[in-house]
Amino acid sequence: MKYLFVCVSLALFAYISANPAYGGNRGGYGGGYGNDRVEYEQILVPSYGRSRGGYGGYDRPQILRSAPSGSRASAAAASAAAAIAPGSYSQYAIPRYEIDGSYNGPSHGHGGYGHGGRGGY
């Protein structure tokens, strides 16, 4: 019985060490590949038109910059843009936990005056 416990414990430890979702740095979507880390910095974009922030309010934190991973980190930041709360972050990008583009994506069209409660570009 104790051999079974030891084997299961070692297998679990190996799985956690190799899995990017638990801190292993062996790939992922911009988070791995040579110990690159993705740093997210949200930039508040002025909202034009009638939206939740009113006229000229800063309620659309949509643009994310990432460093130092170059194009891989930019792709990770763009894919995770909808799930990031305001603030500055330094974390590994794990797309299966961070992608949710259902509502907060950029609004395009209608001349930039906003329809349906959000300002457009």
Curated annotation (Swiss-Prot):
Family matches, as InterPro entries: Chorion_2
Chief place of localization: secreted
Entry keyword Secreted: yes
Disulfide partners: none
UniProt keyword list: Secreted, Signal
Signal sequence range: 1-18
Similarity comment text for this entry: Belongs to the chorion protein S15/S18 family.
Protein's name in the database: Chorion protein S15
Originating species: Drosophila subobscura (Fruit fly)
Lineage: Eukaryota, Metazoa, Ecdysozoa, Arthropoda, Hexapoda
Gene from which the chain derives: Cp15
